[in-house]
A protein has these predicted regions:
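Mid-to-C-terminal alpha-helical segments outside catalytic/metal-binding sites
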Residues: 1-13, 19-69, 99-106, 130, ...
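Alpha-helix-loop-beta-strand connector modules within alpha/beta enzyme cores
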Residues: 93-111, 161-176
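Short, well-structured secondary-structure segments
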Residues: 45, 49, 58-62, 66-93, ...
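Catalytic pocket-lining loop regions of alpha/beta-barrel enzymes
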Residues: 137-299, 350-359
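Short aromatic-enriched loop/helix-cap "lid" or pocket-rim segments at secondary-structure transitions
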Residues: 21-26, 83-85, 128, 186-189, ...
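Acidic-and-aromatic substrate-binding clefts and catalytic sites of carbohydrate-active enzymes
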Residues: 47-53, 119-125, 148-158, 277-283, ...
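Extended, non-globular alpha-helical segments
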Residues: 124-137
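Short glycine-enriched loops at secondary-structure junctions
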Residues: 75-76, 120, 178-183, 304-306
């Protein structure tokens, strides 16, 4: 179905634009050759598309897709950017990223909103996060996990408590994106499975651990946004439910740190604490996300740039699932406007001649 319906506002909560300084660093590290055309790749299987590297080329496509405002996030890559790309401290990397994104925002006024990128397990970055929030950042962006192998740590780590305390106290949403190298990546480097399967799996494991460890019971007002439709959480939340109910009941001296500590059904937290985005090229996935979280807890996300197409297709996925224009507006902008305090006005709905939308 050709996309013919226009909306006055669509907020894309999942964008990773790249500015000239980041491009220069990638070229310096041999990850990108500015003399070659696009697409191109490298030994790390990082595929570079023009839509990610050339904003003057990408922005008309963003507008044609109907997006009017995008959140800039890169919390999933902070660790990699600091350690491998820039080879500097986390604090220096955050300042680099934040300066880069301010330049992008200034270059395209009114089309980007900033987030405060952070390392969830390093409380030392808190002053930078506080400064960004005071400067207008709309959320805190972090990775779903850090490290690798047996040393990989998720956001149920005690080291993340500073983040939850700060976010809850300041009513700031935490945007959670998987890292470049996901859990199990060593078995997923064929067929781009690290990207297709590994990263959503990383989000799934992290979301399950946050629920089971009682993060949302300790911080009942905390709001987190898990990208890629929440990974596979909609498919496995029932399994979390029965394992939570069984737990280690009847087991004498249960092993330390293994029993569930959450006080409510795992399903409940999707109605009160967890939001997800619509990125995934699947109406089935959008429908599952809405059934799990509610229509007012799913926000639009495209991942456009690193994924060099698909804004229109992902708008259509929402349209296919939600025949009601009023319901679509929750996904396209109203929920984002509320949770990120974007200050957008309700300008109504503009309709061009449209084909019927499947129920």
């Amino acid at each position: 179905m050709d996309h013919v319906t226009q909306y006055p506002v669509i907020v894309d909560t999942h964008r990773h634009p790249m500015g000239p300084r980041m491009q220069a660093k990638m070229a310096e590290r041999g990850l990108y050759d500015p003399k070659q055309g696009f697409p191109q790749t490298n030994a790390q299987d990082l595929i570079c598309y023009r839509e990610c590297f050339d904003l003057d080329y990408a922005m008309p496509k963003q507008r044609e897709g109907g997006v009017t405002l995008s959140l800039i996030t890169n919390g999933g890559e902070v660790d990699w950017i600091a350690r491998d790309l820039l080879q500097v401290s986390t604090g220096e990397a955050l300042k680099f990223l934040n300066d880069e994104y301010r330049e992008i925002s200034d270059r395209y006024p009114g089309e980007f909103a900033l987030t405060a990128n952070a390392h969830a397990l390093e409380e030392g970055c808190r002053p930078i996060v506080e400064e960004m929030i005071k400067g207008g950042a709309k959320a805190i962006a972090v990775a779903s996990s850090y490290g690798d192998g047996a040393d990989r740590a998720f956001l149920d780590s005690p080291k993340a408590e500073w983040l939850w305390e700060f976010a809850e106290a300041n009513d700031i949403v935490v945007h959670i994106h998987p890292p470049m190298q996901s859990i199990g990546h060593e078995s997923l480097m064929q067929y781009r499975l690290n990207e297709a399967v590994g990263r959503p799996f990383d989000s799934t494991v992290n979301g399950a651990r946050m629920i089971a460890s009682g993060v949302f019971d300790r911080h009942p007002k905390l709001q987190v946004l898990i990208v890629h439709m929440g990974g596979g959480l909609a498919s496995i939340v029932g399994r979390l439910e029965f394992n939570w109910r069984l737990n280690y009941n009847g087991i004498k001296n249960p092993p330390a740190d293994k029993p569930y500590t959450n006080k409510r059904s795992p399903f409940d937290y999707f109605k009160t604490n967890i939001l997800v985005d619509s990125m995934g090229f699947s109406a089935i996935g959008v429908r599952a996300a809405i059934e799990l979280c509610g229509v007012d807890r799913v926000v639009f996300g495209s991942d456009f740039g690193p994924v060099p197409y698909g804004i229109k297709e992902q708008v259509q996925s929402v349209e296919e699932v939600l025949p009601s224009v009023a319901d679509r507006e929750w996904v396209f902008w109203k929920t984002s406007n509320r949770i990120f305090r974007l200050g957008l006005s309700d300008t109504g709905f503009i309709s061009a001649p449209a084909l019927p939308v499947a129920a």
